[in-house]
């Protein structure tokens, strides 16, 4: 997917008291939440907040230092950013009540052009083609995406996927977290309609199985009712919690009302739903096709490797699948439908044989959690995030200890003791916790309500900050 960055304009009304009342670290988190594209090592950006009561300058680079400075008092907001420390891409002075969306639409060209400064040279050619196409063919969709918090967060999330071995899977997880109508519209233009983003080719990981390994008969009417996915092969598509699917026949097709949960980083979740329709191959009962879909023109082909439907607790349907869409040709996986929420152990030998018929090992499948319990209380989610922060601090201390032992003479009297570092780390963590809990009912809650962001979206942007409940 294409990556974008944006210039930042923040009004005094939005950040009243922030610069004067919070630490560098907390202010950085607040700005990063509002503007996730800021924190790039390869770029230096300048934001100025000018008003009668507030004056602060933020320079963000490798050191990420916050400085406060005095400036002439005015009723205007001056905003801009620089790339490579010298070339000014965008700089504008606008009235305080200016509609920011209008400004962003005007600056779309500069926004996408800035992508090149944060992308590796190996990606430059493809990035040039993609950005040129987006500027020419998807200007409106791109502008809407930048102006939408969820879509902008999705783009920020996609940046973390660059050059990873699991880049495509990472991108899909970003889509799971931040999917909404604006994201869909952007993808439809960039991927399907104008094909600005090249399709990922089939690498043969999920080949079409031999017809001889499929079931010889399958009555779709027997598939009526509720089924759990209790085990899945592909962690990207198959291993979500609380996968409860309900099927019925309609006009000769099998219609599935699907639901599943997406975990948020703090241990919470939100629920996704979808409706899919399958037609049975007239000559191969064990093959079901889900084609003719508008979104990304996706097509999923199901191959039923084994099944037993006898109105018993251990009923099951074992499905291997492969698919294609405008973004990816040849994705696939396998999953087990069961009437029970967990895998009946007595059917495992049958599942092992069926998985081996397509070159897979059922022992490597992931058992899903279908208890479908309530969301953990806020206290537990806070504790989980704090524990993760503590583990990170301890890891950093251990790394420091190794460096000190390896070069003790050079460190001399200037290094801090490990216990001092550990104590300061915990104190900083405690300050962050107290601040976010204290401010949850003030500025941050008001901002969240205005943006209508979900807890998972906010947590993704805050990184290691404390989790926040979903706001309805």
From Swiss-Prot:
One Pfam family recorded for the sequence: VDE
Keyword annotations: Chloroplast, Coiled coil, Disulfide bond, Membrane, Oxidoreductase, Plastid, Thylakoid, Transit peptide
A single cellular component GO annotation: chloroplast thylakoid membrane
Activity regulation summary: Irreversibly inhibited by DTT and iodoacetamide at pH 5.7 or pH 5.2, but not at pH 7.2. Regulated through Ca(2+) gating of H(+) flux at the CFoH(+) channel. Requires the presence of lipids forming reverse hexagonal structures such as monogalactosyldiacylglyceride (MGDG) or phosphatidylethanolamine. A negative curvature elastic stress in the thylakoid lipid bilayer is required for VDE1 activity.
PTM characteristics: Disulfide bonds. Reduction of the disulfides results in loss of a rigid structure, a decrease in thermal stability of 15 degrees Celsius and a loss of activity.
Location (main, coarse): plastid
Gene Ontology BP annotations: chlorophyll metabolic process; xanthophyll cycle
Effect of residue 161 to S: Loss of activity
Subcellular location: Plastid, Chloroplast thylakoid membrane
Effect of pH on activity: Optimum pH is 5.0.
Consequence recorded when altering residue 372 to S: Loss of activity
Effect of residue 297 to R: 55% loss of activity. Total loss of activity. Total loss of activity
Effect in UniProt of substituting residue 245 to R: Total loss of activity. Total loss of activity
EC number: 1.23.5.1
S-S pairs: 133-151, 138-145, 157-174, 161-170, 189-196, 242-372
Protein's membrane topology: Peripheral membrane protein
Gene Ontology molecular functions: violaxanthin de-epoxidase activity
Catalytic activity entry: all-trans-violaxanthin + 2 L-ascorbate = all-trans-zeaxanthin + 2 L-dehydroascorbate + 2 H2O
Effect of residue 170 to S: Loss of activity
Further facts: The amount of VDE in vivo is estimated to be 1 molecule per 20-100 electron transport chains.
Protein family according to the UniProt entry: Belongs to the calycin superfamily. Lipocalin family.
Job of this protein: Part of the xanthophyll (or violaxanthin) cycle for controlling the concentration of zeaxanthin in chloroplasts. Catalyzes the two-step mono de-epoxidation reaction. Stereospecific for all-trans xanthophylls. Zeaxanthin induces the dissipation of excitation energy in the chlorophyll of the light-harvesting protein complex of photosystem II.
Protein's name according to its UniProt entry: Violaxanthin de-epoxidase, chloroplastic
Annotated organism of origin: Spinacia oleracea
């Amino acid at each position: 997917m294409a990556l974008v960055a944006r210039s930042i304009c923040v009004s005094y009304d939005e950040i009243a008291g922030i610069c004067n009342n919070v630490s560098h670290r907390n202010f950085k988190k607040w700005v990063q939440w509002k503007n996730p594209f800021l924190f790039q090592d390869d770029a230096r950006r300048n934001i100025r907040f000018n008003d009668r009561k507030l004056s602060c300058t933020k320079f963000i680079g490798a050191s990420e230092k916050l400085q406060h400075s005095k400036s002439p008092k005015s009723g205007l907001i001056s905003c801009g950013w620089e790339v490579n420390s010298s070339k000014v891409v965008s700089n504008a002075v606008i009235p305080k009540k200016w509609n920011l969306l209008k400004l962003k639409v005007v600056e779309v060209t500069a926004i996408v052009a800035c992508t090149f400064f944060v992308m590796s040279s190996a990606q430059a050619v493809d990035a040039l083609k993609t950005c040129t196409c987006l500027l020419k063919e998807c200007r409106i969709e791109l502008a809407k995406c930048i102006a939408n918090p969820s879509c902008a967060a999705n783009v920020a999330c996609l940046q973390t996927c660059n050059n990873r071995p699991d880049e495509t899977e990472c991108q899909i997880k970003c889509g799971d977290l931040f999917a909404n109508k604006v994201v869909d519209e952007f993808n439809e233009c960039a991927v399907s309609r104008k094909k600005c983003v090249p399709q990922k080719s089939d690498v043969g990981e999920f080949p079409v199985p031999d017809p001889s390994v499929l079931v010889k008969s399958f009555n779709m009417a027997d598939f009526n009712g509720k089924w759990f996915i209790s085990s899945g092969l592909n962690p990207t598509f198959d291993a979500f919690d609380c996968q409860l699917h309900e099927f019925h026949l309609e006009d000769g097709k099998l219609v599935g009302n699907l639901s599943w949960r997406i975990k948020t980083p703090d241990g919470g979740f939100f629920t996704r739903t979808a409706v899919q329709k399958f037609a049975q191959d007239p000559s191969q009962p064990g093959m079901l096709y889900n084609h003719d879909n508008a979104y990304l023109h996706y097509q999923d082909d199901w191959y039923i490797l084994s099944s037993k439907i006898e109105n018993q607790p251990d009923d099951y349907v074992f499905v291997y699948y492969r698919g294609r869409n405008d973004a990816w040709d040849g994705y696939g996986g396998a999953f087990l439908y069961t009437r029970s929420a967990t895998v009946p152990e007595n059917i495992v030998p049958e599942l092992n044989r069926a998985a081996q018929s397509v070159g897979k090992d059922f022992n490597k499948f992931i058992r899903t959690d279908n208890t479908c319990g309530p969301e953990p209380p806020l206290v537990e989610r806070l504790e989980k995030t704090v524990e993760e922060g503590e583990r990170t601090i301890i890891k950093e201390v251990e790394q420091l200890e190794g460096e000190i032992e390896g070069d003790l003479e050079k460190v001399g009297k200037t290094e801090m003791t490990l216990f001092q570092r550990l104590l300061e780390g915990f104190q900083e963590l405690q300050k962050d916790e107290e601040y976010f809990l204290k401010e949850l009912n003030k500025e941050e809650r008001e901002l969240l309500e205005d943006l209508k962001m979900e807890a998972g979206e906010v947590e993704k942007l805050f990184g290691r900050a404390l989790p926040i409940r979903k706001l309805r």
